[in-house]
UniProtKB/Swiss-Prot annotation:
Keyword Nucleotidyltransferase appears in the UniProt entry: no
Keyword tags: FAD, Flavoprotein, Methyltransferase, NADP, Nucleotide biosynthesis, Transferase
Catalytic activity: dUMP + (6R)-5,10-methylene-5,6,7,8-tetrahydrofolate + NADPH + H(+) = dTMP + (6S)-5,6,7,8-tetrahydrofolate + NADP(+)
Cofactor: FAD
ThyX domain residues: 1-237
Cofactor note text: Binds 4 FAD per tetramer. Each FAD binding site is formed by three monomers.
EC number: 2.1.1.148
Residues annotated to bind FAD: 88-90, 192-194, 198
Gene Ontology molecular function, alphabetical: flavin adenine dinucleotide binding; NADPH binding; thymidylate synthase (FAD) activity; thymidylate synthase activity
Pathway terms, separated by semicolons: Pyrimidine metabolism; dTTP biosynthesis
Gene designation: thyX
Protein name: Flavin-dependent thymidylate synthase
Species, as recorded: Haloarcula marismortui (strain ATCC 43049 / DSM 3752 / JCM 8966 / VKM B-1809)
Length: 247
């Protein structure tokens, strides 16, 4: 998996603050300087004022201003299972690598056993891995080796069958039906800062599946560089709380 910040609103926290101050200003924020807009906010410098205002907004549940700052992420190599989970979220725009127009006829099926094309879950590589809804708390070495081999055999066979169907003239849009839900996909997705916090509330939580949790954590790391005061406050004061931010 690889996650990159593809594009994002410049000076996002200036924009958040301008939008928030607009609600309480008798002068349009479009006709005055940022310094004038922030004049009544506590702080000795503009950076302190931004920190004060952003903390106040998040602490009091005034999330609307955070919808003005937008970020676009490029995600490479997550499973179709992870894609199905993240695309359930509203107010996020997606473009997804197509399996109708992109075929995988040149992939070596044996390489699939080692992570090519199909995501390998930790439970197929780590005998001590404990996952949600697992039927057995622990497994023997023999059981682990057997399940790891079954997993690798199955995905290798699926890719071989897919490629055979292509060779027999089946269109990629139909041949893809035999590929596993772990097949890797690339995604471009855009969301505002408020929505990213909501996604993190749901998908960085301990009860989220390991893959989408890892993806979300990487997005949060990138967001911390892009929108630092907002996501520092989120990490310290909001992340993991029971009252999750509504979409």
């Amino acid at each position: 998996m690889d996650v990159k910040l593809l594009e994002a609103t410049d000076d996002p926290e200036d924009l958040i603050c301008k939008a928030a101050r607009n609600d309480y200003s008798d002068t349009s924020v479009g006709s005055q300087s940022f310094e004038a807009t922030m004049a009544e906010v506590d702080g000795d410098s503009l950076e302190e004022k931004k920190e004060t205002l952003i903390g106040h907004l998040l602490d009091h549940g005034h999330f609307g201003p955070f919808e003005h700052a937008q970020a676009t992420f490029a995600v490479e190599g997550v499973s179709r299972s992870c894609m199905a989970q993240i695309t359930r979220h509203r107010h996020v725009s997606f473009d997804v690598q197509s399996m109708r127009y992109v075929s995988f006829d040149d992939v070596d099926p044996e390489a699939v056993r080692e992570g090519e094309l199909v995501v390998t879950p930790p439970s197929a590589t780590d005998p001590d891995w404990i996952g949600r809804n697992q039927q057995k708390a622990s497994v023997s070495d023999e059981e682990f080796e057997e399940r790891a081999e079954i997993f690798k055999d199955t995905i290798e066979q699926a890719v071989e069958s897919y490629q055979e169907l292509l060779e027999l003239g089946m269109p990629p849009e139909d041949a893809r039906f035999v590929l596993p839900i772990g097949t890797k996909v690339n995604i471009v997705m855009s969301m505002n800062a408020r929505m990213l916090m909501h996604v993190a509330d749901m998908r960085a939580a301990a009860d989220a599946q390991w893959e989408i949790r890892e993806m979300t954590e990487e997005m949060l790391e990138l967001a911390a560089d892009w929108c630092p005061k907002t996501f520092e406050y989120y990490e310290q004061e909001m992340k993991g709380r029971k009252n999750r931010l509504a979409p």
